[in-house]
């Protein structure tokens, strides 16, 4: 595996890139970390990035602005710019076939916002379907609790407005393939919210584009978990999805 750290994609914000060995054709997974939009880091992704690289998928781990210094939608704008930057520059590191976008927890909220509110990727010269597949891991499909909190609203409220990915479902006729991951012991109401998001997509006729992975775990604990066989649980979830929706390899 090759590692390229601290790639500045805009002033003050960087990406860490984990790549397969030189000369290999690969896919690219642009990943947004969790932390409630107020903490977390792009660092420390090697436990799943290394096995993904061994199976032909590079990982670009993205730094983005967070509360309290940021305000909505700064973090979404940053992530859109990171995706566009990597799409434009990944050829400098080798031959890339496909582009995937995803994230865990708050990162899953961010990947959903890019997937469903087309304005963010359109602002950087892309459209959501330019991404071949999305991996939404335990993200909040309603308005994120910290978006509510920092707007002066009770963070326990369930609100579906323009700050919520679910608000935009059905506004586009076409969606890329996508995977939702959720746990039976996830954050309070996250399991039910995820099922509602999936059912809403199905109601609009997109059942064939959606996959759902259930984990027996606490919230996102599988992301850096190694199973009894010594393999990354998260990498295996991702590769299982990709191999299903892209059987040609």
Model-derived features with residue positions:
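N-terminal cap/lid segment of alpha/beta-hydrolase-fold proteins
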Residues: 1-23
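Short beta-strand element of the alpha/beta-hydrolase
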Residues: 25-35
């Amino acid at each position: 595996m090759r590692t390229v750290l601290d790639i500045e994609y805009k002033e003050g914000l960087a990406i860490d890139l984990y790549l397969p060995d030189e000369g290999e054709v690969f896919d690219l997974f642009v990943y947004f970390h969790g932390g409630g939009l107020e903490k977390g880091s792009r660092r420390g992704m090697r436990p799943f990035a290394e096995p993904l690289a061994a199976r032909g998928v590079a990982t670009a781990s993205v730094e983005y602005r967070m509360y309290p210094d940021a305000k909505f939608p700064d973090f979404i704008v940053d992530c859109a710019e990171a995706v566009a930057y990597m799409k434009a520059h990944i050829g400098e590191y080798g031959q890339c076939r496909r582009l995937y976008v995803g994230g865990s927890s708050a990162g899953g909220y961010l990947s959903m916002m890019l997937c469903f509110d087309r304005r963010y990727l359109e602002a950087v010269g892309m459209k959501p379907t330019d991404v071949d597949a999305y991996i939404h891991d335990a993200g909040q499909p309603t308005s994120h609790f910290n978006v509510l909190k920092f707007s002066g609203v009770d963070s326990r409220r369930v609100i579906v407005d323009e700050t919520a990915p679910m608000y935009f479902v059905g506004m586009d006729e076409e969606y890329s393939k996508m995977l939702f991951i959720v746990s039976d012991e996830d954050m309070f109401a996250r399991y039910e919210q995820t099922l509602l998001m999936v059912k809403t997509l199905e109601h609009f006729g997109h059942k064939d584009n959606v996959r759902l992975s259930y984990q027996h775990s606490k919230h996102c604990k599988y992301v850096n978990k190694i199973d009894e066989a010594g393999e990354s649980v998260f990498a295996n979830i991702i590769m299982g999805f990709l191999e299903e929706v892209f059987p040609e390899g």
